[in-house]
């Protein structure tokens, strides 16, 4: 910024004496930008909070209504098969409600920046095998869950539970959207990072929706149970671990969800 002062002005003598003062306002502009960003962040946080409360009101009420409603009907049911159907519906909605509460707690920790990362030595092959064994029992007969052959030996430092959480979310989503075919758990070493992936032969995702699925409360199919928070939480976890997350998909052919992690 330049301020110009006229010290002596005598037009009859064709004299004008000026004083120019140059001010460095770099720090002022930097502070101004910081304040603008802080304001925008606060406004965005307020918007997300309102959206969060509106969505949670609906998401919590849905399984609760099912639990309360079918619990009442269970008392009146006389047929054993009918009772079994009601119990199954109640159990499914209990699981959905528990998952929703778990996601809310994770999300609140992320917002408060208290989302702890506990580093330990992780065996990549063992991690994927544990997931494979746990999810095999939950896979329908029409779908084959696979663990990629000849996985490379790899041990690195990370938060094992958080890595498992991300991979579990990928496999769970793949099972929801794959009615037949196969789902493959894989990882490959690429330079100084490892790339984990879960590939399925499911319904696939439209190109315009692929970026949005990592946004909170975005659900590809409102008829399939889910909170719409899982992938958003996965993105936050992967970012905190120093990696990247993404998806490659083609409608009608399937999807491949992946994330990278630095090897140290």
Predicted features along the sequence, with ranges:
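Short loop/turn elements at sensory-signaling interfaces that couple input to output
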Residues: 2-18
């Amino acid at each position: 910024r330049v301020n110009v002062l006229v010290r002596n002005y005598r037009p009859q003598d064709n004299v004008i004496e000026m004083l120019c003062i140059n001010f460095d306002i770099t720090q002022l502009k930097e502070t101004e930008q910081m304040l603008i960003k802080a304001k925008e962040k606060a406004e965005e946080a307020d918007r997300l909070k309102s959206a969060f409360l509106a969505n949670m009101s609906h998401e919590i009420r849905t399984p609760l209504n099912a639990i309360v409603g079918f619990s009442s009907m269970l008392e009146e049911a006389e047929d054993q098969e009918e009772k079994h159907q009601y119990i199954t519906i109640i159990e499914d909605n209990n699981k959905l409600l528990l998952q929703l509460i778990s996601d809310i707690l994770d999300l609140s920790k992320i917002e408060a920046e208290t989302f702890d990362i506990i580093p330990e030595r992780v065996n990549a092959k063992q991690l994927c095998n544990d997931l494979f064994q746990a999810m095999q029992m939950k896979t329908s007969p029409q779908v084959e869950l696979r663990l990629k052959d000849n996985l490379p030996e790899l041990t690195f430092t990370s938060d094992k539970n958080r890595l498992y959480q991300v991979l579990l979310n990928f496999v769970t989503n793949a099972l929801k959207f794959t009615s037949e075919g196969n789902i493959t758990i894989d990882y490959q070493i690429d330079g100084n990072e490892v790339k984990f992936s879960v590939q399925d032969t499911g319904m696939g995702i439209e190109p315009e929706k692929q970026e949005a699925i990592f946004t909170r409360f975005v659900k590809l199919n409102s008829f399939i149970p889910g909170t719409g928070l899982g992938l958003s939480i996965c993105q936050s976890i992967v970012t905190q671990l120093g990696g990247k997350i993404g998806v490659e998909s083609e409608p009608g052919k399937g999807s491949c969800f992946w994330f990278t992690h630095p090897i140290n």
